[in-house]
């Protein structure tokens, strides 16, 4: 299972330098039977990005993209974990993404993000990360 944060999901709707490599990487992962997920937070954030920056028709494309993902709920235990997970410098919404991904830790093969602070937090808690196309 691949967890995608909003920085990754956005690249699938709004063309950015990493978009092509991300799509290629996801196609390869899908060919190996990998499913993808995000959290309820990722869903809300993506729809807000589309509302702010999207072109006509992107709301429908965003909903189609989200329909193909497992949407992980933000339960009370997830919120409780978000209060303490990762480094103290981790931003609140990033901590929620980490805690949401922790729900699928056993199945998690990669946490896809392009956010440097979130990448650091992922590594601190032991998640394998991927940022296809990013220059590090």
Curated annotation (Swiss-Prot):
Mg(2+) binds at residues 5, 94. Keywords: Hydrolase, Magnesium, Metal-binding, Nuclease, Toxin-antitoxin system. This is Ribonuclease VapC47. It holds the Pfam family PIN. It comes from the Bacteria. The lineage of its organism: Bacteria, Bacillati, Actinomycetota, Actinomycetes, Mycobacteriales. InterPro entries: PIN-like_dom_sf, PIN_dom, VapC_family. GO terms for molecular function: magnesium ion binding; RNA nuclease activity.
């Amino acid at each position: 299972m691949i967890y995608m944060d909003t920085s990754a999901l956005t690249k699938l709707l709004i063309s950015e330098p990493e978009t092509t490599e991300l799509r290629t990487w996801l196609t390869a992962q899908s060919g190996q039977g990998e499913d993808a997920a995000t959290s309820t937070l990722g869903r809300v954030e993506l729809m807000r990005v589309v509302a702010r920056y999207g072109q006509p028709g992107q709301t429908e494309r965003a909903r189609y993209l989200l329909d193909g993902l497992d949407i992980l709920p933000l339960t009370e235990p997830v919120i409780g974990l978000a209060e303490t997970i990762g480094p103290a410098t981790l931003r609140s919404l990033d901590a929620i993404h980490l805690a949401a991904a922790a729900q699928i830790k056993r199945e998690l093969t990669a946490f896809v993000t392009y956010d440097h602070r979130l990448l650091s937090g992922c590594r601190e808690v032991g998640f394998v990360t991927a940022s296809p196309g990013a220059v590090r």
